[in-house]
């Protein structure tokens, strides 16, 4: 994913910006021909969680208690491992906020090339996808579901980068949502010899029976996420605190740090 908005995000992580500062930064990012209002509308659809109040622009995650934050727990199945030559074939997602599941999302995606190995892992066949909606339609619906929630997944870079690249290739732009990896968070909060989704499913007593299907795997990920949140220190209060803690290099003492 390009780092187009990185400078903007770094500044907003440190402090809110005045409207004038924010507009000037948009012009700096976009060049001489940029229209700040148009650039703002693009940013709003990119997943960056902005908050406008009292003539200032805030990064919402720096203010929102994580217990009130909007999280989107995501899992995908794909027809290969390379986001530049393969595609998502199934998306499952859960909107989780205030300790409740607000809504779920699930869709297959039309594809004519499912390798036998992928069918063996997921059970998804070419025939199952022949009447499914095209990828552009599914991604449009998914972006409306995701909005500016924090994107949560087990090994988040895989799911996020796959979907972000697919969005870009289908003219929706890259995703810039904050992202949280439940492998990293679990390594800092849960004592376990391994951290794969399948292992934690059994080790933590979740016991969902279906693996390698998008919505079911997102349900397992949510249960892992909830167990992690219960172990957080009280000094972790905002969503930004949670993201910073998750991405820190420390791990829970005694863990073997295996995936």
Predicted regions and their residues:
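Conserved non-catalytic scaffold segment of RNase H-like nuclease domains
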Residues: 59-60, 69-164, 176, 191, ...
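Ordered, small/hydrophobic-rich secondary-structure cores
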Residues: 1-24, 160-184
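N-terminal accessory regions of nucleic-acid-interacting proteins
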Residues: 1-69
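Active-site catalytic microenvironments for nucleophilic, acid-base chemistry
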Residues: 166-169, 188, 203, 227-231
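Short, glycine/acidic-enriched loop or turn micro-motifs at the edges of active sites
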Residues: 78-80, 184, 220
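Short alpha-helix plus adjacent loop in nuclease-associated cores
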Residues: 179-196
């Amino acid at each position: 994913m390009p780092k187009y908005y990185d400078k903007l995000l770094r500044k907003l992580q440190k402090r809110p910006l005045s409207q004038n500062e924010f507009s000037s930064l948009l012009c700096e990012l976009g060049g001489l021909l940029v229209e700040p209002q148009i650039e703002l509308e693009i940013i709003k659809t990119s997943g960056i969680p902005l908050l406008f109040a009292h003539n200032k622009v805030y990064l919402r995650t720096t203010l929102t208690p994580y217990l009130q934050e909007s999280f989107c727990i995501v899992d995908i199945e794909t027809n290969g491992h390379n986001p530049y030559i393969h595609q998502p074939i199934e998306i499952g997602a859960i909107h989780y906020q205030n300790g409740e599941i607000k809504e779920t999302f699930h869709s297959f995606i039309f594809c004519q090339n499912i390798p036998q190995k992928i069918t063996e892992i997921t059970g998804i066949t070419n025939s199952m996808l022949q009447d499914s909606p095209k990828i552009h339609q599914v991604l449009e619906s998914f972006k409306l579901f995701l909005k500016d929630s924090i994107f949560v997944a087990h090994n988040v870079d895989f799911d996020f980068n796959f979907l972000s690249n697919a969005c870009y290739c289908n003219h929706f732009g890259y995703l810039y949502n904050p992202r949280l990896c439940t492998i990293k968070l679990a390594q800092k909060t849960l004592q376990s010899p391994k951290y794969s989704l399948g292992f934690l499913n059994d080790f933590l007593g979740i016991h969902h029976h279906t693996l390698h299907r998008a919505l079911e795997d997102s349900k397992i990920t949510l249960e892992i996420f909830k167990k992690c949140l219960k172990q957080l220190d009280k000094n972790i209060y905002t969503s930004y605190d949670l993201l910073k803690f998750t991405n820190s290099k420390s791990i829970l003492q005694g863990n073997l740090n295996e995936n």
